[in-house]
Amino acid sequence: AGTAAALAPADAVVLAAEDPLAALQRLATAWRRALGAQVIAITGSTGKTSTKDVLAAMLAPHRRTVATRQNLNTEIGLPLTVLSAPPGTEVLVLELAMRGAGQIAELTTISEPDVGLITNVGPVHVELLGSVEGVAAAKAELIAGLHAGATMIVPAGEPLLAPHLRADLRTVPVGPGGELTEADLDGLELPFDSAHMRQNAVAALAAARAIGVEPSGRIEVALSAMRGQQRQMPGDITVVEDCYNANPMSMRAALDDLQRSAPGRKVAVLGDMLELGPDAAAHHAAIGEHARAAGVDVLVAVGPLSAGLAADHTVADAEAAAALLPGLLSPGDTVLVKASRGIGLERVVEALA
C-alpha cells in the first residue's frame, strides 16, 4: 500500500487492500447489486463466446446491455467487466472461463446470475479435471451457484449434467428434443447458417426469453476475433479464421461447416488440441478421419500431437505452416485454420493477408 501511494499522482485517490484481487471481486459484486441489472452467465466446453455474442446482439435493441469483451472472463476479467457497466445498465451478459475445479463457483459467487447457460459438455481441459465427468461437474458449479427460482438453460438430454440439476430452478432444455429448438429461430434473420452457430442461437434465444425479451428481425452479430470469421484474401482465397481455441467438439463442427459451405477445394490447417489428457492421440486421430469424411482436399497438420491426423502435410509449428501454405493454394480455395490458442495459427492467416 505504501508503494502504491508513493507512485500515485499527488491528487489521486488510492484504495489500499491486503488482497487486491479479493477487493476487486467484492467491488464487482457490490456494483452488480447497485446496478440492479439482470445477469446472464454463460459457460460450456465450446460455443460460449459465440453464444455470448449472439445473445448480446439479440438484447441490444431492447435493453441497455453490457457483455464480456475479448477474454475478460476470468477471476480478474469478470470483475472488470462488471465494473465497466455504466449506471443504467439493464443486462449483464457474462462469459465464465474455466480451467479447473472451483473456478466457475468463484465467478458465480462474484456475479450472482439470474440466468445460467451451459452450452455443452465435452472433453475439454480433461488433463486438468481427469475425465469428461469432471468437466461436467466443474461446469455444473454454475447450476449449484444460482439462487432459488433462477433459470438454468442446458443442452437437452445431456446425461452428464442430469445429476447436477436442481428442482428449485426453472430448467430450460434446448436443442433437439428440448423446450426450444431450431424451429424457434423462424422469423429471425441471422448472419450465419452453420449448424453449431444455429444451436448457439437457440440457447441465446432461450436466455433472452428468460428475461422477458423476444428478439425479432435481423440480428446484427459481431463475432469476437479469431472465432470462425470468414476473410477474403488476395488470390480469391477464403480463410475461416478459428484460431482462438480447439477441442474435438469444435473441430468436428468446423469441419462440418467447411464441408457444407466451401464451393471449391477444401483446405484444412489443423493444429494441436491441448489439455486432452491421456486420450489426446486418439482424439487427434479421430479428427483426421473426420476431416477425410468431410471431404477435405488438402489437410495440413501443425504440431506434435497433430502428427496423428495422418495429414497430407505435417509441420512442426505455425511458422512452418505459414511458409508452406501459400504454395499449396489455388484461386477459389476455402481454408479452415483452427487449433488451440497456444499453437498461434493466426500467423498462418497473417501470411495469406
Predicted regions and their residues:
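Acidic, Mg2+-coordinating active-site environments of NTP-dependent enzymes
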Residues: 5-12, 115-238, 263-264, 289-298, ...
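Short acidic-hydrophobic, aromatic-tinged amphipathic segments that line or gate anion-handling sites
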Residues: 14-19, 313-321
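Phosphate-binding loop of NTP-binding sites
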Residues: 16, 21-156, 160-168, 350-351
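Buried hydrophobic packing segments
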Residues: 24-27, 55, 59, 81-82, ...
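Short amphipathic alpha-helix with an adjacent loop that forms part of the alpha/beta core around
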Residues: 109, 322-329
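Active-site beta-alpha connecting loops in nucleotide-dependent enzymes
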Residues: 224, 235, 243-314, 318, ...
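Peripheral docking tails and interdomain loops at the edges
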Residues: 314-317, 332-350
